[in-house]
Amino acid sequence: GMDALDIMKRNGNPGQKGTGNDLGEILLYVFLEQVLGAPKIMSKVELQTGAKQYGSKCDGIHLLSLEQEFGMPYYHMVFGTSSIVGDMKKAVDTAFDAIVEIEKQSTQERTLAENTVFSKSFDKDTVQKIKDLLIPSKGQSIPYDTAYGVFLAYNLGLNPANYSAVDFRRALTQKMDTDIRNHAAYIASKINALGLGNHSFYFYILPLNDADAEKTQIMDRVMNGGGRP
């Protein structure tokens, strides 16, 4: 709605990182909430406001229930980070640079999430679960671990003008599959080298035609209704 757009415009320029107007921050939120099914505890904007004292590097904090998988109450507190860079390897490196910083501050991030939860409009059952999780009563603690949600966007490197619509879709799928395969081992090596092997990771990857330009152009269109003439 217009209220949301007004708030976005007050927070910063289209595509400005750390304001909630960054395409990566928004798509990270969508993937974690809609695809992973992890409700948001704090958005980037809320973190920027609440974490001024230590400068949060996190792009969002979400909570994922894994009770169905494990047959007992168990959660992942998912710290989010996003990176939109033309070169996929650089996008991965940028995301892991942020993860290293988040890891250093994970105690502060958790405390901030704990303090925020009470003002959230979760349903009563969810609020109670989160309270039990974050502030266990004596003798009762629900197990949870911290995990990372990572959104990456990069240049696909295909020119749509060279393909029919159907062929482009096919080429896109093949190229993306190849790109992800080529970088999977690199991502695994980063996780091991940085001593992050005890965390779960949720990766979401999106190819763009020109990542560096489009991350601003798309947000400009969203915030300014079709962009400037």
Model-derived features with residue positions:
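Short, well-structured alpha-helical interface segments that form or flank functional binding sites
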Residues: 23-27, 55, 90, 144
